[in-house]
């Protein structure tokens, strides 16, 4: 028992040190260190600290953690398998978990949503290699900014199922494209593959992609929509990251808490 406590304490120290380097952008590997420390602490003590949650139900290669990013109180999901980012081939291999579905479910539970169902408040963002600060895949969880929500709602009536369509500037100075999925079941969708296929002949590297999952109303029913943009897109002034699209806390939402 004492040995487990000592190792758990050591894992916490490692995680807090990694948090510090991450917070000050000193090391692009810091998030991976935090993930490993959370997993180690969870295995030894049953507590996910300093993460909010550790899920290893399918084993470490299929698991994920949920945690706050330093300072900004940004909530993210990060896999417990080493995955560099949106460009990682594993995400399109057919063997990867549906991290977007996991993130949507977790964020919905945090904010009084409807579990896996579409919710027009929520959105998930994976940054491109140009805008991310860490070389471990992580999904930013939040609510769309009011301006982004209005832009998506205005574009929705023009979207056709299964077709990527330009929707203009979802945020200032950055054009986006949208794919109406025709589905209200995110577990049946593969946003990473859909974005990769949609932009395969348009960009030189998938590392340039920013991928977003949101929802919109079509014919009175909500469906999931996959949005994407890329660094160097025509008329883009600078690459857009999650901080331009998301509110870190949803209005009137309860304080985030995840039970084990």
Regions found by a protein language model. Give the residues of each.
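Bacterial N-terminal signal peptides that target proteins for export
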Residues: 1-9
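Bacterial N-terminal signal peptides
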Residues: 8-18
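HIT superfamily nucleotide-processing domains
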Residues: 20-260
């Amino acid at each position: 028992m004492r040995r487990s406590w000592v190792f758990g304490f050591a894992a916490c120290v490692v995680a807090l040190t990694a948090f510090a380097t991450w917070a000050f952008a000193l090391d692009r590997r810091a998030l991976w260190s935090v993930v490993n420390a959370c997993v180690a602490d969870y295995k030894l003590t049953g507590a996910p600290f300093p993460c909010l949650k550790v899920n290893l139900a399918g084993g470490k290669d299929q698991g994920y953690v949920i945690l706050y990013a330093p300072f900004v109180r940004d909530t993210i999901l990060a896999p417990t398998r080493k995955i560099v980012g949106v460009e990682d081939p594993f995400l399109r291999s057919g063997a990867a978990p549906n991290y977007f579905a996991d993130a949507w479910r977790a964020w919905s539970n945090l904010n009084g949503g409807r579990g896996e169902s579409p919710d027009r408040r929520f959105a998930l963002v994976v940054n491109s290699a140009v805008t991310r600060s860490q070389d471990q895949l992580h999904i930013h969880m939040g609510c769309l900014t009011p301006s982004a929500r209005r832009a998506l709602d205005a574009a929705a009536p023009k979207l056709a199922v299964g077709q990527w369509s330009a929707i203009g500037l979802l945020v200032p100075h950055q054009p986006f494209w949208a794919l109406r999925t025709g589905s209200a079941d995110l577990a049946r969708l593969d946003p990473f593959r859909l974005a990769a296929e949609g932009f395969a002949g348009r960009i030189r590297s998938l590392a340039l992609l920013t991928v977003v999952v949101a929802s919109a109303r079509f014919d009175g029913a909500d469906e999931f929509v996959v949005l994407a943009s890329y660094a160097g897109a025509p008329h883009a002034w600078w690459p857009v990251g999650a901080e331009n699209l998301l509110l870190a806390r949803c209005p009137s939402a309860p304080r985030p808490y995840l039970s084990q």
